[in-house]
């Protein structure tokens, strides 16, 4: 699952850097490898089928995933909310209750209920068949597994330094400085 993709990418990057390091200009090149988010492998025991708790036909639309966004039919929001508060491995908020740090929920297109699974949990409405169990992102962005990777090397970077986690937005000024853009 997730670890397999990481190992695959590691091998690709190793081949790439091996070839680049053979070039005469290699000592002059700065490299940055980053991602927009982390990934977590699903834990089958943490799977939540919302169909076990709620009738699917009580919703106008459901966006499965992480987070899961529910658009209840009129008059069903409070009922669904009270039921979902008791479901293990998830946190549910009414749209207006989503904590500000998530920067999510204020847009008119967001559904009335937002379900954030615990890391490794998958939430879906399924009638039959096996759930998709690979990996996902979109969990609590304060969880270490959701942090983006950042690797940098080259003449502009100190060697053998481990930097604390940083938000991706801080990469913009760094890249501008490297490219001498003001």
Placement of each model-derived feature along the sequence:
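A long, amphipathic alpha-helix that forms part
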Residues: 1-29, 175
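Sec/Tat-exported extracytoplasmic proteins
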Residues: 17-24, 74, 84-88, 178-182
